[in-house]
Structure formats: structure tokens, C-alpha cells
């Protein structure tokens, strides 16, 4: 596939935002909203908070459809504000809360935006899944919050807008994704004493990938795999969508785009290395040839704790790493012939013109279709490639509204393509 390339690379590392200032660093308790508390990241964040007595005040929790779990979380942490995705869930949630506990409850994306911009909240953990997290993330940025960002799609879709909004509002981004958090930790020396680390002497970022459940297999072997096999990730416990993205390597493609926006380096300076043990989470190569790596167990509580506690490190009960017991670590280059989604993501980012929006929307719809057994494993990459080929827009979306309009337009087109394919077979 050939996509017209319009973007020019940026020459040096330039972090997306200023870093949190002294007032935030010294705030006790640190006030927090968690958007997506019932998902994998949200649940892990609450595990971290349980060990931090007096250090945080959980002001707001928001979940999507698991209302009983949200009610259980709310009963334990007693936030003043709750959010649900559907208006119809408010009554159910209210009925499950303890007698005498009456928080405010908001609904829908507008409700999530409200919780992201509460006056008394300093920190927002953005942990919604997919493009659905963009509006609330962007609202938090415009409100000048410190955002612990787990919703990578916000940067994939609107990285340039978010960078500009951070500059205007003073918002700060701290990356929760394990790979980008690892890079952030490796850059700690470059960040020291600077609120705006624009010019770290970095030559390369190396994102590690587990390879997913199908590492080492060829295309013929993968033609007939189904959701059950693709969901069997060897190392990480994650939600269904991101687990499928790991199997196709689309997750790593999205992370390349995320890294480009977070760290400002050109795509040519962002590489992927398959490391099936998931112990080294990423590496930074400096201009003198040295490389720094961050190692740890494959457990999201570590990067979550690093973001919530920054610049301090929080206590966690994650099992400690025993390198002697591991014995050895392995590395390989990704097989981009067998896993074409990785290159599709690179092409989309290089092309611009809203192509990353199309890439993400088509992938989300294709993954849903694969999980429903409406398309095969390679149907995911085929659907994404076809959506990119059909995209004719010649300019970048100029606002969040334009981005989400393109997102919806792409989804409608992709659903029609998937339905037409099913009707033919």
C-alpha cells in the first residue's frame, strides 16, 4: 500500500508538555479522578491506592458498563462524584450504593468530561478504552490538569492538538503505557532540574514488544486462528481489545505513534524490538552510544504507581524481579510480513491527513468483528488497509470535533465493508 507522505520529522526529543510543578508534587493528599475505573488499568490503579494511606484523595470514579463493580469501588473509596456511560445506569448504581452515601452521579461523555475538569481535582487518570477516551482527555488537558495517560488513542488521534493545548493551559502528561513509562523513567536524568526538557541528547527510542501469543508463527499457521487463541497472551493481563492488538502488533504500531507525539522524535528514530519475556519494557539510546533500559515484572501497577507518585516512587506489592532465576532474555526483530499492522501504523502516521484516525477507527471495528467471529485474524489488517486506501481527505483535522466526525465516518464505512464481506461468504 502506498500513502502520500506529507509530514517532516522533528530532529530532537521534545517532550509533549511541561512536567508537574512543585505545588502538585507537594500536594497531600493528592486529589484524583479515575476515568475507566472498572477496566484493567482502573482496577490496577485502585490496588496501588490501597497501599497509600493518606497520600491520595479519590474525588471521582467513572466506569462504563460494569455497574456492580463500580458500586463496590465507590462503597470502598467513597468519592464525591461518580460517572457512568449510560443515563439508564444511574438508577441501578444508586440502588447498589450503601445507605447514607449519596455522591453526585453524571452520565455520558459529557459527564466524563465533567469529572475530568473538577475544580478540586489535580490529577486525572485517563483509562478509558479507545477513541471514546479522547473528549475527556482533551477536556482535562484544556483544564490544565496533570494527566496520567493510559488512553493511547488520545495521542494517536489528536497528538498535535494535545501538544498545543498543553502549551496553552500548562497541563502535564505522564505516560502510563508500560513502554512509554519505561522511556520516561530512562529519561529521568535528562528531566532533572527542568520543567520543559526539550533537548535531551537522545538518538533512538526502542519499544519492546512481547510478540503476543503468535510470536514465531507464519502466515499459513495464523489463517485459521480464532479469538480464544489470540486472547491467550503469554505475559500480560489486559482487556480483550488491547490483547488482540498485541496479537496483531497493532498495539505496537499505535505505541509508535504515541511515542512520536510524547517525545517529538521522527518515526525513523523509534524502533521496535521483540522481547518475548516482557522484562525490559523499553530502551533509550543516547547520542554517545549508551543505552538505558527499564526492567521489571510485566505488571501495570508499576507504571501506574510511577505516574501517580511522580517524582516519588510509591510502594507496591508487585513481586520483585529475580534475574538469576530468569537466566536469560531473548530479542528478535519483528516479522512485519506476518504482522502487517505494524507497518500500516507507521504509514498512517507518516501520511497524516487524518490517516491515524482512520487507522484507529478501522482497527477498533475490525477487532470487534474478529472477537464476534465475523472476520478472520488477517481480516483485521485487510480491513485497516482498505480503510486507509479509501481515505481521500487532503488536510489534517483541525479540531476534536473534526477528528471524531472522521472517526464515525470511518466506522460506518468499515461496518458496511465487513457486512458486505459476510454476505458474500
Name what the model sees in each region.
Residues 1-425:
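Catalytic, metal-anchored helix/loop core of enzyme active sites in primary metabolism
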Amino acid at each position: 500500500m502506498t500513502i502520500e507522505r506529507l509530514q517532516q520529522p522533528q530532529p530532537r526529543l521534545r517532550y509533549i508538555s511541561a512536567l508537574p510543578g512543585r505545588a502538585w508534587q507537594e500536594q497531600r493528599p493528592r486529589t484524583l479522578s479515575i476515568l475507566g475505573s472498572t477496566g484493567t488499568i482502573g482496577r490496577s490503579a485502585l490496588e496501588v491506592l490501597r497501599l497509600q494511606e493518606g497520600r491520595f484523595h479519590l474525588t471521582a470514579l467513572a466506569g462504563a458498563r460494569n455497574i456492580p463493580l463500580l458500586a463496590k469501588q465507590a462503597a470502598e473509596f467513597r468519592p464525591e462524584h461518580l460517572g457512568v456511560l449510560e443515563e439508564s445506569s444511574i438508577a441501578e448504581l444508586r440502588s447498589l450504593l450503601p445507605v447514607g452515601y449519596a455522591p453526585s452521579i453524571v452520565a455520558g461523555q459529557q459527564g466524563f468530561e465533567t469529572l475530568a475538569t473538577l475544580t478540586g481535582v489535580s490529577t486525572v487518570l485517563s483509562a478509558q478504552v479507545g477513541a471514546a477516551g479522547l473528549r475527556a482527555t482533551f477536556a482535562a488537558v484544556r483544564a490544565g490538569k496533570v494527566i496520567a495517560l493510559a488512553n493511547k488513542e488520545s495521542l494517536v488521534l489528536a497528538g498535535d492538538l494535545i501538544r498545543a493545548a498543553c502549551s496553552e493551559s500548562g497541563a502535564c502528561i505522564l505516560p502510563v503505557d508500560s513502554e512509554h513509562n519505561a522511556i520516561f523513567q530512562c529519561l529521568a536524568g535528562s528531566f532533572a532540574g527542568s520543567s520543559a526538557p526539550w533537548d535531551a541528547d537522545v538518538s533512538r527510542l526502542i519499544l519492546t514488544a512481547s510478540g503476543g501469543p503468535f510470536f514465531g508463527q507464519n502466515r499459513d499457521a495464523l489463517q485459521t486462528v480464532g479469538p480464544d487463541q489470540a486472547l491467550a497472551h503469554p505475559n500480560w493481563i489486559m482487556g480483550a481489545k488491547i490483547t488482540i492488538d498485541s496479537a496483531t502488533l497493532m498495539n505496537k504500531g499505535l505505541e509508535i505513534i504515541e511515542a512520536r507525539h510524547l517525545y517529538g522524535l521522527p518515526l525513523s528514530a523509534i524502533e521496535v524490538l521483540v522481547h518475548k519475556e516482557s522484562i525490559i519494557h523499553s530502551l533509550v539510546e543516547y547520542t554517545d552510544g549508551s543505552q538505558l533500559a527499564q526492567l521489571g515484572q510485566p505488571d501495570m501497577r508499576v507504571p501506574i504507581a510511577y505516574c501517580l507518585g511522580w517524582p516519588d516512587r510509591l510502594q507496591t506489592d508487585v513481586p520483585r524481579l529475580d534475574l538469576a532465576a530468569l537466566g536469560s532474555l531473548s530479542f528478535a526483530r519483528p516479522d512485519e510480513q506476518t504482522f502487517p499492522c505494524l507497518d500500516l501504523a507507521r504509514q498512517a502516521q507518516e501520511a497524516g491527513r487524518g490517516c491515524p484516525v482512520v487507522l484507529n477507527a478501522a482497527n477498533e471495528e475490525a477487532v470487534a468483528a474478529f472477537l464476534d467471529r465475523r472476520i478472520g485474524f488477517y481480516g483485521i489488517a485487510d480491513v485497516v488497509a482498505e480503510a486507509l486506501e479509501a481515505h481521500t481527505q487532503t488536510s489534517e483535522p483541525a479540531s476534536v470535533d473534526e477528528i471524531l466526525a472522521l472517526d464515525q465516518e470511518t466506522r460506518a464505512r468499515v461496518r458496511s465493508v465487513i457486512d458486505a464481506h459476510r454476505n458474500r461468504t
